[in-house]
Amino acid sequence: MLFTLPGQRLEAAAELVRPGAYVADIGTDHAYLPIYLVGRGIASRAVASDINRGPLERAASNIRAAGLSDRISLLLTDGVDGLFGLGVTDYLI
């Protein structure tokens, strides 16, 4: 599935990510940015985090539908709590 981003803000963020990066999307909501980056081969892996369970459940559904569950992790957290133990070193968005 070829995924497109809904909006210029997400497109602008995606343009800044270098190929092969490991990205964390803080406040991911639907996980559109991680799905786009990993699905297009821009990022090698990603973490999609959110403080609320509802958005994270939507993100999980979207990630599964995109077939990227093995390369995009989910994290229920406030901000960056618990993130750095996952090895994300390239980009926090």
Name each model-derived stretch.
Residues A31, I35:
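Glycine-rich SAM-binding Motif I of class I
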Residues N52-R53:
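Conserved SAM/SAH-binding beta-strand->alpha-helix loop
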Residues V88-I93:
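A short SAM/SAH-binding and catalytic strip from SAM-dependent methyltransferases
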